[in-house]
């Protein structure tokens, strides 16, 4: 990575800031950039800076389906054009079907008056472009930096850093991931469940072109998604019980290609090539609250959801937009941006929305796990009915888009 990023050593005592954001992933970097562009003095603390994105490197296995609301936010932050032009795979159609009942539902951008349903983009590309924009926006980057503790006071919060330094701010934003050490330090618990599944991921070449279509098939063991990449391949996310995931990861390449072809119902023809495979565990986790004194949670630190709807990062970016708007309104009204009543608006709105979405995704996962013939038949009837109810289907698509 280019070492001229001028990241500030955390040992230096910085002057008081409006906001300190901890966690430099996609959501944390977007939050720091959004708040800085809104005129708040902002610092971003991260233990490890991202590696430079390389257009000549293999497409990263971790990809995100960016919804239109996320694209709008990234465009407001001045980074979307760079992301799109670098390597973003647009999709205009989505086909979802049930392996057991055969019921299917289709979504089409043109029928909804949109150009695209979304874009499939590498996580590290989004993160890198956000980091590239931080310096010009005036964000102070403390990297490497780790927070060992913090103490909220009447008018500020003081962070104790691992190197012995301190930092003071009006508000601390924790965007430090699902395991969130800061959430634990704040004494905020979580609720949820372990799905006892792993998502197997890889990029594959197929016999037929994907035609800018996202495919998702609900199988007895979990959903399989084929997401269109900019280079013509598809990114797969195959949710499987843990033992089955281990078996699939251990298959030789041809056996894996054959099984994946069957699992995908050969909708794109034979699967002809694959990258090395990886897997990550799946769980549902929701923070019991999103705020503490001069402290808020953001992104995966607040909520982790099943990937079947592809909404995890989109929910985090909606957190960013809501927090920015909340703080801008508070400043315009002459209020303290770290005051409990100010943060309550953000926490109430986002926790309510995130909880409804997370429980909806969880319910969908449970419904498609049904194996009873009667329940499978009922599920099929419901899906076919939804596909015929254009207004309801359009509202579902708009919700997924973030509108």
What are the residue ranges of the model-derived segments?
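FAD/FMN-dependent oxidoreductases across multiple families
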Residues: 246-333, 337-338
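Conserved FAD-binding catalytic core of PHBH/FMO-like flavoproteins
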Residues: 74, 156-158, 165, 171-277
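Conserved N-terminal helical subregion
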Residues: 14-16, 86-185, 192-198
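Extreme N-terminal leader/targeting segments of oxidoreductases
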Residues: 1-19, 34-38
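N-terminal Rossmann-like FAD-binding beta1-loop-alpha1 element of flavoenzymes
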Residues: 18-44
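N-terminal FAD cofactor-binding segment of flavoenzymes
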Residues: 58-98
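Glycine-rich FAD pyrophosphate-binding loop
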Residues: 36-59
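C-terminal helical "tail/cap" subdomain of flavin- and related membrane-associated enzymes
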Residues: 325-403
């Amino acid at each position: 990575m280019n070492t001229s990023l001028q990241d500030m050593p955390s040992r230096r005592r910085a002057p008081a800031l409006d906001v300190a954001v901890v966690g430099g992933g996609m959501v944390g970097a977007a939050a720091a950039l959004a708040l800085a562009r809104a005129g708040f003095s902002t610092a971003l603390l991260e233990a490890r800076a991202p590696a430079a994105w390389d257009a000549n490197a293999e497409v990263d296995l971790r990809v995100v389906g960016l919804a239109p609301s996320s694209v709008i936010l990234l465009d407001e932050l001045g980074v979307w054009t760079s992301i799109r032009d670098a390597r973003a795979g647009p999709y205009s159609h989505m086909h979802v079907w049930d392996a057991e009942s055969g019921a299917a539902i289709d979504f089409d951008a043109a029928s909804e008056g949109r150009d695209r349903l979304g874009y499939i983009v590498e996580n590290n590309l989004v993160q890198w472009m956000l980091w590239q924009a931080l310096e010009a926006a005036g964000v102070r980057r403390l990297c490497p930096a780790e927070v060992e503790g913090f103490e909220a006071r009447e008018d500020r919060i003081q962070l104790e850093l691992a190197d012995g330094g301190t930092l003071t701010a009006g508000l601390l934003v924790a965007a430090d991931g699902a395991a969130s050490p800061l959430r634990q330090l704040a004494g905020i618990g979580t609720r949820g469940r372990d799905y006892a599944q792993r998502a197997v991921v890889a990029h594959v070449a197929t016999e037929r072109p994907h035609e800018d279509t996202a495919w998702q098939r609900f199988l007895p063991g979990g959903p399989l998604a084929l997401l269109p990449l900019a280079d013509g391949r598809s990114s797969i996310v195959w949710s499987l019980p843990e033992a089955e995931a281990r078996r699939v990861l251990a298959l030789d390449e041809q056996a894996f290609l054959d099984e994946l072809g069957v699992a995908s119902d050969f909708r794109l023809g034979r699967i002809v090539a694959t990258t090395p495979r990886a897997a990550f565990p799946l769980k549902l986790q929701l923070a019991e609250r999103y705020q503490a004194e001069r402290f808020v949670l953001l992104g995966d630190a607040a909520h982790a959801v099943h990937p079947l709807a592809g909404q995890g990062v989109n929910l985090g970016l909606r957190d960013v937009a809501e927090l920015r708007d909340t703080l801008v309104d508070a400043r315009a009204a002459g209020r303290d941006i770290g005051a409990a009543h100010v943060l309550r608006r953000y926490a109430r709105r986002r926790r309510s929305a995130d909880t409804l979405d997370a429980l909806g995704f969880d319910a969908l996962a449970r419904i498609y796990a049904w194996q009873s013939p009667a329940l499978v038949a009922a599920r099929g009837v419901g899906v076919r009915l939804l596909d015929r109810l254009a207004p309801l289907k359009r509202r579902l698509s708009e919700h997924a888009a973030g509108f």
